[in-house]
């Protein structure tokens, strides 16, 4: 047997051998390409789609099935040579494509229908494949009907039209007419129809061909065949759903007769030519293919996998479900196409990756990628449009998602390259933000007033106050009771302020789809992107990706800084103590002239250090997704990558669940370590507890032992710093003995008289004396500020300030004087501070003066020094 496609001659294929082995998928594909006259690996099968048909034939052995197919379709199936033997010729199943080139009339001309079909075949459309199945009731198989049943089920799963080859003289008989084969066909098709997903449109055409018909009237034979079919149908066991159904529910029954092949050859050929029109001439009244495509809806490029899957299920004696097989085929084919397209897109993106590694940056990268993604999706839809729509849509969505992942990976590599430059520009700003927040914290911490014993008794618990009273009884010094609630509120405010400030820096990098705000941001972000500014401005997805990388990097940088501060907690809070001790709240350097001033500021400085220790206990910043909702018109025209990245924007917030709000140090006094929050549930790193109301162990920077150790070292360092300050104060005291002035007047009388008698020298001496007098008065005023009554000091300050304002209003300052004054009184905290611009809140005690504390000692060294100062006047008296 041979098959032709546009005149090309090809050998047929042994689809199923006599041992029941199906031709491999690759072999079936190779045959189909050859039958279509196309080279392997092209899209010929895909172009055919479902516009093809399959015709199969079943019947008894040696009943002339192959001969009938050769005459009808021009195939070259092997036929039996009666002169040599009688027996089995077709073993298993053979497949071939219909060849109408050799089908000509007696005059040698091809009939009109065949000519039309030839033109159709030449146009690569509506191919017709013919399957010749092994005959039944053969001596070779004996009583084994399992293979017969398997072939019947396979034929019903693939053939649009199933020819039943039957001798006319056997009509009315059971065994001779091979009615057992019909019973098998009915049963297996009933098995197929039993599935819920089976549709009534998927019933094959059962065409009964009565061979060697010599009578004139055909109606009697057709009625007899129908009665035989009905009797078989009534005797088989049917499912409940088909109890009252007829055979027409499962089959479209058609009948035809043909004259004797040998005795009436001319009539046989004539009737065969007419019969052939049933298969290709759509204008024929008996045309069999009412739909343009294969009735199972399996595309030709999926037929190899479909046949393999069906035959495997049949051979394993499993329940064959054609819709399920089509679903499996659709899924397999869609996954195959998806894999191919994904590989092509990955190779496409790898070219840009290589260019990036060479330092070449491509403009409009996302637009190029989006265009290729659209092309790939159209290609996928084109190759899978004939399969089940729900599976195609699902796989297409999966493909689009995976293509987006590959695209985002490439955009991420570009963003990572550019974000390294952006981080260099932002590093100073981020460090300044953290420094500004710490300065604000210490500024507010030293303004928190201490509680009196009564206030502490009213605000604290019984256990806490009993502890304070025991401390008071054990020490003769005053106890500075820390306002625990206010300190913890300040710690929380510090983290909120830091989050807002960092978020303000990061938001400059994100796209703003409002044109008004976009123009305002362009000038601010130009310096951040440096030479990549124009590249980023033209690609919103790249800008979003850069912002994501920078957000994560800023978060990691700040977290590492606080982790480093926590590792050296004692040194960190001691530096804060020194900063508060040595600088005024306006940032100017503080000089101490008396020990009383040092005594007054030391508790505030120690409290500021302890508040900072509370900030180092737990890292309260976390990154969450900022679910920004944009209008459709705002995101119209954006790429998939940009829209996806919009949904993953980062936002820095403060950790403040119910347990984290309780996870603060408990302050009692400045002379004892803060109590650790032991009762809070802490989630382990690998814990299965996914509750939100827990404390994250990864964010706990200080353990209970670390807090105690840091406090002990902090106390020692503060004592040492106080000793250095006391030595500095003592070194500045240079009082001359009382007898020095009279001796100077006595010995220098002549020089004094000479100066008084000389006007020039007198003026010079007066000027020098005025300068020294001014310095002396300023020094005495500083001492008075430190030791005098607060009400008097504040009153004098107000009067002096009013006099200065009046003087400035009457006598304008020169430009040089203005510059020098600004330089002299510049506040170190007034430099570019992101926290000041990003957050408009302030601490309630920020405007208040430092609390005036009663003169008392806070350390052993300072106590001894004060006692020594009090004993000196007594000894002189």
Curated annotation (Swiss-Prot):
It is found in: Endoplasmic reticulum membrane. Residues 49-307 form the GB1/RHD3-type G domain. GO terms for biological process: endoplasmic reticulum membrane fusion. Keywords: Coiled coil, Endoplasmic reticulum, GTP-binding, Hydrolase, Membrane, Nucleotide-binding, Transmembrane, Transmembrane helix. It is a multi-pass membrane protein. GO terms for cellular component: endoplasmic reticulum membrane. Residues 388-410 form a coiled coil. This is Protein SEY1 homolog. GTP binds at residues 59-66. The chain crosses the membrane at residues 736-756, 760-780. Residues 1-735, 781-877 are cytoplasmic. Its main location: endoplasmic reticulum. The keyword Repressor does not apply. Its EC number is 3.6.5.-. CDD domains: GBP. InterPro entries: G_GB1_RHD3_dom, P-loop_NTPase, RHD3/Sey1, Sey1/RHD3-like_3HB. Residues 850-877 are annotated as: Disordered. One of its GO terms (molecular function) is GTPase activity. Residues 867-877 have a biased composition (Basic and acidic residues). Probable GTP-binding protein that may be involved in cell development. Belongs to the TRAFAC class dynamin-like GTPase superfamily. GB1/RHD3 GTPase family. RHD3 subfamily. It comes from Trypanosoma cruzi (strain CL Brener). It comes from the Eukaryota. It is an enzyme of class 3 (hydrolase). Residues 757-759 are lumenal.
């Amino acid at each position: 047997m041979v098959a032709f496609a546009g005149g090309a001659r090809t050998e047929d294929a042994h689809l199923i051998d006599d041992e029941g082995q199906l031709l491999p998928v690759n072999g079936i594909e190779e045959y189909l390409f050859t039958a279509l006259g196309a080279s392997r690996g092209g899209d010929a099968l895909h172009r055919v789609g479902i516009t093809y048909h399959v015709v199969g034939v079943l019947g008894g052995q040696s009943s002339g099935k192959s001969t009938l197919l050769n005459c009808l379709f021009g195939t070259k199936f092997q036929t039996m040579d009666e002169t040599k033997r009688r027996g089995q010729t077709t073993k298993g199943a053979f497949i071939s494509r219909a060849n109408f080139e050799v089908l000509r009339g007696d005059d040698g001309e091809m009939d009109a229908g065949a000519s039309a079909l030839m033109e159709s075949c030449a146009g690569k459309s509506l191919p017709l494949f013919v399957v010749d199945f092994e005959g039944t009731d053969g001596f070779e198989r004996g009583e084994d009907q399992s293979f017969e049943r398997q072939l019947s089920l396979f034929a019903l799963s693939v053939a649009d039209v199933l020819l039943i080859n039957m001798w006319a003289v056997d009509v009315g008989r059971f065994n001779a007419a091979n009615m057992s084969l019909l019973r098998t066909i009915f049963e297996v098709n009933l098995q197929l129809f039993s599935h819920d997903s089976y549709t009534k449109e998927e019933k094959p055409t059962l065409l009964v061909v009565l061979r060697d018909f010599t009578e004139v009237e055909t109606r009697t034979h057709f009625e007899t065949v129908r009665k035989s079919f009905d009797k078989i149908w009534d005797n088989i066991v049917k499912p409940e759903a088909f109890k009252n159904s007829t055979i027409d529910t499962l089959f479209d029954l058609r009948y035809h007769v043909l004259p004797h092949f040998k005795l009436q050859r001319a009539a046989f050929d004539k009737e065969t030519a007419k019969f052939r029109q049933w298969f290709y001439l759509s204008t024929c009244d008996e045309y069999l293919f009412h739909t343009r495509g294969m009735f199972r809806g399996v595309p030709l490029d999926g037929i190899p996998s479909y046949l393999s899957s069906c035959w495997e299920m049949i051979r394993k004696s499993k329940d064959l479900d054609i819709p399920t097989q089509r679903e499996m085929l659709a899924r397999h084919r869609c996954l195959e196409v998806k894999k191919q397209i994904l590989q092509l897109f990955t190779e496409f993106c790898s070219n840009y990756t290589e260019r990036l590694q060479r330092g070449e940056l491509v403009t409009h990268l996302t637009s190029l990628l989006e265009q290729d993604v659209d092309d790939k999706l159209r290609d996928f839809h084109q190759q899978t449009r004939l399969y089940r729509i729900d599976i195609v849509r699902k796989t297409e969505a999966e493909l689009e998602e995976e293509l987006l992942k590959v695209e985002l990976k490439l955009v991420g590599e570009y963003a990572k390259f550019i974000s390294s430059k952006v981080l260099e520009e932002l590093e100073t700003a981020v460090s300044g933000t953290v420094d500004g927040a710490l300065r604000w914290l210490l500024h507010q911490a030293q303004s928190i007033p201490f509680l009196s014993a009564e206030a502490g008794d009213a605000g604290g618990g019984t256990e806490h106050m009993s502890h304070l009273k025991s401390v008071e009884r054990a020490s003769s010094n005053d106890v500075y009771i820390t306002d625990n609630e206010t300190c913890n509120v300040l710690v929380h405010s510090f983290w909120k302020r830091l989050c807002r400030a960092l978020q303000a820096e990061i938001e400059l990098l994100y796209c703003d789809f409002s044109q008004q705000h976009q123009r305002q941001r362009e000038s601010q972000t130009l310096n951040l992107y440096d030479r990549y500014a124009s590249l980023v401005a033209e690609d919103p997805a790249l800008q979003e990706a850069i912002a994501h990388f920078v957000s994560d990097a800023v978060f990691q940088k700040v977290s590492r800084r606080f982790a480093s501060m926590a590792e050296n907690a004692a040194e960190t809070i001691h530096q804060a103590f020194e900063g508060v001790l040595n600088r005024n709240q306006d940032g100017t350097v503080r000089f101490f002239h008396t020990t009383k001033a040092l005594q007054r500021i030391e508790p505030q400085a120690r409290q500021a250090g302890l508040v900072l220790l509370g900030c180092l206990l737990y890292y309260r910043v976390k990154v969450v997704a900022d679910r920004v909702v944009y209008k459709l018109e705002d995101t119209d025209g954006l790429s998939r990558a940009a829209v996806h990245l919009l949904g993953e924007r980062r936002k820095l917030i403060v950790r403040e669940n119910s347990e984290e709000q309780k996870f603060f140090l408990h302050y009692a006094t400045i002379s004892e370590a803060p109590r650790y929050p032991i009762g809070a549930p802490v989630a382990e790193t690998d814990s299965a507890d996914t509750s939100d109301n827990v404390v994250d162990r990864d964010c706990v920077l200080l353990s209970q032992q670390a807090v105690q150790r840091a406090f002990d070292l902090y106390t020692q360092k503060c004592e040492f710093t106080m000793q250095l300050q006391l030595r500095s104060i003592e070194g500045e005291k240079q009082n001359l003995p009382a007898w020095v002035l009279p001796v100077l007047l006595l010995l220098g009388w002549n020089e004094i008289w000479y100066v008084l008698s000389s006007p020039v020298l007198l003026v010079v001496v007066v000027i020098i004396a005025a300068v020294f007098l001014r310095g002396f008065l300023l020094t005495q005023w500083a001492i008075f500020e430190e030791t005098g009554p607060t009400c008097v000091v504040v009153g004098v300050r107000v009067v002096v300030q009013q006099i200065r304002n009046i003087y400035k209003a009457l006598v304008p300052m020169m430009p040089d004087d203005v510059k020098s004054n600004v330089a002299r009184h510049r506040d170190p905290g007034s430099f570019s501070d992101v926290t000041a611009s990003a957050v408009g809140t302030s601490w309630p005690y920020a405007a208040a003066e430092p609390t005036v504390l009663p003169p008392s000692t806070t350390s052993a060294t300072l106590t001894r020094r004060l006692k020594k100062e009090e004993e000196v006047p007594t000894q002189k008296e």
